[in-house]
Amino acid sequence: PLGDVHGRVVGQLRSVHARGVEGCRTMYGARGFVCHHNTDIWGDCAPQDRVVPATLWPMGGAWLCLHIIEHYRYSQDEDFIEGYFDILRDAVLFFMDTMVKDAQGYWITGPSVSPENTYRTENGETGSLCMGPTMDAQILRQLFAGYLMICKDLSANDELARQVHEHLEH
């Protein structure tokens, strides 16, 4: 069943988290954990390969954490979520430390990429790195909303939850 496979993906987050905490600190000087576009059975989280339209994507950890949120959303298993809350919280912390406000006052990620996508500038040059790709915003909206839902259920509302709420509002 799909649930069995899902459990293995969520279980893999333990090794990804351990390596991603170190990568977050050394690469970004930030709290939390980060996983880029690729990982493996050893939990490697650093950017890999030479394909710029995918390599630098820092959303892998957040995307994987959506599995934690979905599992909890449909199971309401508090033992499960208490066992993974540290990973979810660390994924959120990374973005609290690294997001910046754009000219319109919105919180955005960057530099990032929209995996395997390139854009063309007005003068015809192509690029991949950008600020605030839509895919990042969609993943973070789900991550942040899920985090707040779980904080409410666990009565774990704190300063981080307040910051997350502010980021969702702006």
Question: PLM features: what roles do these ranges have?
Answer:
Residues E82-D86:
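Aromatic- and glycine-enriched glycan-recognition loops and surfaces
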Residues Q12-S15, R19, I87-K101, G146:
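Alpha-helical scaffold segments in carbohydrate-active enzymes
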Residues R31-I81, M96-H165:
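The feature captures the catalytic groove of carbohydrate-active enzymes
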Residues P1-H36:
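Carboxylate/His-rich catalytic cores and anion/metal-binding grooves
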Residues H167-H170:
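Glycine-rich phosphate/pyrophosphate-binding loop
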